[in-house]
Regions:
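Short coil-to-helix segment of the ABC ATPase nucleotide-binding domain corresponding to the Q-loop/switch region
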Residues: 99-107
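Conserved ABC ATPase "signature" region
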Residues: 106, 110, 117-135, 187
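Conserved ABC transporter NBD signature motif
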Residues: 70-82
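Conserved signature/switch motifs of ABC ATPase nucleotide-binding domains
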Residues: 138-141, 159
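Catalytic Walker B motif of ABC-type/P-loop ATPase nucleotide-binding domains
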Residues: 164-167
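The feature captures the beta-strand-to-loop junction immediately N-terminal to the Walker
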Residues: 47-49
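Helix-to-loop junction immediately C-terminal to a conserved catalytic motif
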Residues: 62
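Hydrophobic anchor residue at the start of the ABC signature
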Residues: 153
Length: 256
């Protein structure tokens, strides 16, 4: 895959990245020579079979793990651990149970130089963005799974990152809530100038949300594949081109 040398805010470049673990004393390679350029403001979905290294790649991008070889660049600078320009959203939002919605979102913003009033003002903006302005005073125990995940998204956006990294954020939700949240994410990503990298096992979700899909191989020596999703937004799951992309992915995974 070609790699552009010029970068803008939120651009990610991965060069010759490999990562392995030791399983019972034997090296197990999960990522092999990954090369990729993610454009500023792009939405990239990462899919693959279990064990293909999806979450591992996201954790390396987040700075939560080191690669064995290769490098990750954000805006042309090498990633060395976690950074304020990257925010991570996990499947479980991990809200602080003793804080209400507004305080969960504003938590930590004051340490970034904002006054308490500024921090709460910014938090209110993002709580409204995810549609929870009527629940600012609610506590996590009072929220549904979808509402809690919205709080997690608002909290991540409140730090105003250049890059949003999402590890199966909707995986624990029921089918109807998941569809609603996918629509919300598509709207938020349209309104916010942020690069998004999403790990998902849901192929339809990847097509609905992403500009491009990176398919990681499970087999040793396999090559990653990139698929362009050139569809208008908002996307119609019943549209012929959407269905064609779904069939293409199902065929690639041997599910059709």
């Amino acid at each position: 895959m070609s790699i552009a040398e010029d970068t803008r805010r939120g651009e990610v470049t991965i060069r010759h990245l490999s990562k392995s673990y030791r399983l019972n004393g034997t090296p197990l390679q999960v990522l092999r020579d990954i090369n990729l350029h993610v454009r500023s403001g792009e939405s990239l979905a990462i899919v693959g079979a279990s064990g293909s290294g999806k979450t591992t790649l996201l954790r390396v991008l987040a700075g939560l793990e080191d690669s064995d070889t290769g490098e990750v660049l954000v805006d042309g600078k090498a990633v060395r651990g976690v950074g304020a320009e990257r925010a991570v959203i996990f499947q479980e939002p991990r809200l602080l149970p003793w804080l209400d919605v507004l305080d969960n979102v504003s938590f930590g913003l004051e340490t970034s130089g904002l006054s308490r009033e500024q921090a709460r003002g910014r938090a209110r903006h993002y709580v409204k963005l995810v549609g929870l302005q009527q629940f600012e005073a609610a506590y996590p125990r009072q929220l549904s799974g979808g509402m809690a995940q919205r709080v997690g998204i608002a909290r991540a956006l409140a730090v105003q990152p250049e890059i949003l990294l999402l590890d199966e954020p909707l995986g624990a939700l029921d089918a109807m809530t998941k569809i609603g949240m996918q629509q919300e994410l598509a709207r938020i990503w349209r309104d916010e100038d942020v690069t998004t990298i999403l790990v998902t096992h849901d192929l339809e979700e990847a097509i609905y949300l992403a500009d491009r899909i990176l398919i990681l191989p499970r087999e040793k020596g396999g090559e990653p594949r990139l698929i362009e999703i050139d569809l208008p937004r908002p996307r119609d799951r019943s549209a012929p081109e959407f269905v064609r992309h779904r069939e293409e992915l199902l065929n690639l995974f041997g599910l059709h």
